Amino acid sequence: MTSRGNAETPLLRLAGVRHDGLEATALELEPRSMVFISGPSGSGKTRLLRVVADLDAHHGDIWLDGRHRGEFKGHQWRHRVGMLPTESRWWHKDAASHFASLPGTEALKGLHLETAVLKRPIGQLSTGERQRLALLRLLANAPRVLLLDEPTARLDADSTGRVEDRVRAYVEESGAAVIWVSHDENQAKRLATQQFTMNAGRLTATGGRAK
C-alpha cells in the first residue's frame, strides 16, 4: 500500500511491520501526504502508531528519508517521528516547563489559547487546552512525520478547525507527512490524501486524495 506520488524515495516507508494483533503492514508516505486511518476500537490503529513511533517493539523494517530505523537512537527517532496520543501526557506542573522555547503569541492565538495558559497548573486546564498545547509541544520538535491519534475527538468544532488548519499549515511549510487516526468521515474528506481502514490488525486502502 502506498501514498506515494513521483518521489523516488518516500519520506516514510514501512515493510513487513507487525506486532501482536497487527498483521504485516506495508505503507509509504510522500512529503505532505496526510494518511487517514479509521476502524473499530481495538482493531490496531493506535498499535500501528505506537510501533511507527518506536514506542512498542515490533518486527519488520521502517525507513525515514531513506534511513533505516536502526540508524537512529531512540530519542532521535521520536523527535523526527512524533506521536500525539488521544490523551496528552504531562510530567511538569505547568505547560511552559515542557517547552525549550515557548510558543509565540501568534501560535497560541491560532489555536485559540492565551499566553497565560502556559503558566497555569496542568490540572486546571481543560482537556481541549491540554490537547492543543500538546500539539504545539509536538510541533516544537519539527518532526518529519506526525502520528495523530484522534487529536480532535474531544474538541469542539471551532477548536477542531483550528487544529486542522495548524496541522495543514505545518505540513505545507515543512514538507512533513501525517498518519491521522480519526472516526470523522468529514474530517477525512477535508484533509486526507489517502484513506485506510484497520480491521483486526489488517490495513486496507479505501479512498484516494481529498478534493
Cite the ranges covered by each PLM segment.
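Helix-to-loop junction immediately C-terminal to a conserved catalytic motif
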Residues: 52-53
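Conserved ABC ATPase signature
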Residues: 121-125, 129
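ABC ATPase NBD coupling module
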Residues: 69-82
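Helix N-cap at the start of a conserved alpha-helix in ABC-type nucleotide-binding domains
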Residues: 157-159
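H-loop/switch region of ABC-family ATPase nucleotide-binding domains
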Residues: 181-183
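Hydrophobic anchor residue at the start of the ABC signature
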Residues: 135
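Catalytic Walker B motif of ABC-type/P-loop ATPase nucleotide-binding domains
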Residues: 146-150
